């Protein structure tokens, strides 16, 4: 399914997306679930998980094309969306980078798994690479592996 939106709406979505440091799909999903009053934690978590899967698939496609900058951003999106899914299950919304980082610390401590924090830092490097384009290909490849491990650990800890 695809959704066609007026240019004015798309520009507003992109503006909010940039201001919140999220991807446009998340803004659109949030608006739809709020409009439909489907604000229960499990629905929100499912949306974030689906976005995480989509972004990881996109990252892999960009890797195949040799576009490591876009692959970096999509992998970051996959990690942040899976973290938001975990938070949503608890009734928590993470709307800033600071909130994401604090929640990672909470999860790592609760599970006694400090590797979660380190893997999250790899995702953060990928996010920065989207803006700076300074990571060599090999680091992007390895950091995306870290993101996959991060996602796996979050899923296993449920």
Model-derived regions: residue spans:
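Amphipathic, well-ordered alpha-helical segments in soluble domains
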Residues: 51-55, 81, 150
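Short amphipathic alpha-helical segments
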Residues: 2-5, 13, 20-33
């Amino acid at each position: 399914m695809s959704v066609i939106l007026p240019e004015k709406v798309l520009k507003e979505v992109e503006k909010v997306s940039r201001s919140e440091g999220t991807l446009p799909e998340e803004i659109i999903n949030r608006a739809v679930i709020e409009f439909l009053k489907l604000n229960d934690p499990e629905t929100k978590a499912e949306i974030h998980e689906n976005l995480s899967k989509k972004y990881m698939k996109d990252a892999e496609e960009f890797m195949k094309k040799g576009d490591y900058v876009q692959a970096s951003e999509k992998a970051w999106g996959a990690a942040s969306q899976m973290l938001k899914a975990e938070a949503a299950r608890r009734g928590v919304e993470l709307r800033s980078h600071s909130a994401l980082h604090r929640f990672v610390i909470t999860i790592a401590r609760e599970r006694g798994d400090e590797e979660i924090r380190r893997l999250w830092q790899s995702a953060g490097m990928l996010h920065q690479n989207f803006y700076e384009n300074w990571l060599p290909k090999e680091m992007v490849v390895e950091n995306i592996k870290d993101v996959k491990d991060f996602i796996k650990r979050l899923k296993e800890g449920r």
